[in-house]
């Protein structure tokens, strides 16, 4: 299982890349491996308001459909339209292919997320 230093992680297997008051959010390598071959990603609407813990996307694979939960609260600024036509990009590199970009409405929520090392330890216990 791969992690990327500098990103933050949730126990629901989402990653967050913070840039100022904005954040990119995607699913982790652990999540895409567990799902298997991804065939569809349901994207939210730009300007949607999401709260920490809310489902913001459904990721469907040949095995299952799984909600992706937002690790932070914010307003959706952008969605990764490439995933509409090529959901398999999440299998190819889950960390290079974000799902949404949000404007953070409560940056203090970031303090409750895991570092790459903490997340790797969490996943080892889950496996």
Curated annotation (Swiss-Prot):
The keyword RNA-binding is assigned to this record: no
InterPro entries the UniProt entry points to: Biotin_lipoyl, GCV_H, GCV_H/Fam206, GCV_H_sub, Single_hybrid_motif
GO cellular component: cytoplasm; glycine cleavage complex
Highest taxon, organism lineage: Bacteria
CDD domains: GCS_H (cd06848)
Signal peptide from the UniProt entry: none
Modification type N6-lipoyllysine: residues: 63
Keywords, comma-separated and alphabetical: Lipoyl
Entry note: cofactor: Binds 1 lipoyl cofactor covalently.
Keyword NADP: no
Pfam families: GCV_H
Requisite cofactors: (R)-lipoate
Domain annotation Lipoyl-binding: ranges: 22-103
The protein's assembly and partners: The glycine cleavage system is composed of four proteins: P, T, L and H.
Entry similarity comment: Belongs to the GcvH family.
HAMAP family assigned to the protein according to its UniProt record, in alphabetical order: GcvH
Functional description taken from the UniProt entry: The glycine cleavage system catalyzes the degradation of glycine. The H protein shuttles the methylamine group of glycine from the P protein to the T protein.
The name this protein goes by in its record: Glycine cleavage system H protein
């Amino acid at each position: 299982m791969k992690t990327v230093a500098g990103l933050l992680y949730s126990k629901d297997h989402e990653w967050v890349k913070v840039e100022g008051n904005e954040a990119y959010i995607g699913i982790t390598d652990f999540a895409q491996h567990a799902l298997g071959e991804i065939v569809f990603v349901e994207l939210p609407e730009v300007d949607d308001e999401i709260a920490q813990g809310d489902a913001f996307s459904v990721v469907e694979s040949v095995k299952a459909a799984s909600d992706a939960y937002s690790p932070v609260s914010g307003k959706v600024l952008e969605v990764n339209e490439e995933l509409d036509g090529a959901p398999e990009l999440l299998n190819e590199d889950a960390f290079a292919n974000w799902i949404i970009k949000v404007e953070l409405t409560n940056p203090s929520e970031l303090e409750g997320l895991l570092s790459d090392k903490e997340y790797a330890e969490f996943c080892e216990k889950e496996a």
